[in-house]
């Protein structure tokens, strides 16, 4: 039984799911989905078949062709803390499809259910976040990026709500008894006050890109194939529409660089502030944190990254999470190429500078376990969420930039387009990429130590710090801070959030409380509306013992659930002793129900690690 993926029960000798037809009844009162899944395999199969599940109650399994007959199944009693529970089906000879009925748990790791008081619309809300290995908590599946699926989805929701999904919207209509295939009884499915939203995803995607949301959602059109959705009414929608007004132009830039956009639409959903990521690249419907709406179009930076995934990550996908750099390193490179065209070379270089500082910071984070500074780490038994970091993004970017510098941009552009067209709608591993690289760039292995880049720990000696006038100027100003010199108002007059972020990232960590407060008194960084700036400043302030910022830290941790902010703030508090550590535990005890389950688990692990 060869494993396909260290994070899945999928058996490499067996066919995998090729299509899923899903019917979901969203029970907001119980924070539960009552569901059915008609799964079609990539080839006929007989005997045992393993699927991934986590905290699912599986009610029945039956054949889907001819008169239905029960299929024997068993669910492992003891759930693995990382993998969940294997669902074993004993299929009749030459089975190609079968039907499962099941229910999710209120604690499903992919789902967050928000009650009306927790939303801006005063209506209930639910959204999914399946990356890295959480689709198995929504429906039984081969939850590995090696197994790409198409899917149909029916979402049965209260009529006052709207639903969206990372798929083509087919219709909004009355429920029909024939819809649900046993997900629940007819009376519940067709009850008054319910509506069905129907979706189809015809291009194959890995299960982690399955996504939906339902709530008081409205929208604004941005262009012929772009639209922004949001919960929170006209004010939020208008702000989002202004922030992302240039998205259609960005799509065109992406096509000019990387080839045709294969997903038809590029829509955006601004989620409630508990969303645990900056953005999630779900095809056709990118999920975004509201913290990217800054009022200065800077949020387009996050959108550029998620757009770039349309080619690198969604079209070509890492085969396992050990190959995650293939998704994120390529996408970080592609994002910066888009930014370079749309916002200029200086802005792209600034982006690279922030990334360079982030990569160096990860070396410190993983100094006691350098395995996770490799581009291809060994991750058996490790939850990907626990070691999520900037390494695959920034070291992956550095590797690709190193190749570009070696062969020249025109040749690298040709290589990149060839790579995308060759492997689109496929999942590949690092070894496949390296073979493709060596075949298409003969002799590259003699010019770059490929093994050192992929298997080596730390930052390779031929990685390069970015060069630009603004980057050097900001680093120089940061170096002067130690001696007590603050940047003048003229020097920062044109700074956006990114400039401040880079400045704060480059400040020495062993600073005095008086220096921190002096900086804040002049520039009010602790009150910034840009969370990148605010959190970077608070992270600097916490170790100095500046208790005057405890209120701002608490507000951040209670108002926003993005892990990019939770990790450094909880870590900074928990690494201290006394009052700071107590504050971290108190805030978490009061705020944990606000967090998405993924973020909650990460915060718990930080507090547990530091006692």
Swiss-Prot record:
Tell me yes or no: is Lyase among this UniProt entry's keywords: no
Q: Which residues bind substrate?
A: 129-131, 278-282, 562-564
| UniProt: Zn(2+) binding residues | 305, 309, 328
Needed cofactors: Zn(2+)
Q: What is its main location?
A: cytoplasm
Q: Belongs to which family?
A: Belongs to the peptidase M1 family.
**What is the protein name stated in its UniProt record?**
Leucine aminopeptidase
Question: Which organism is this entry from?
Answer: Oryza sativa subsp. japonica
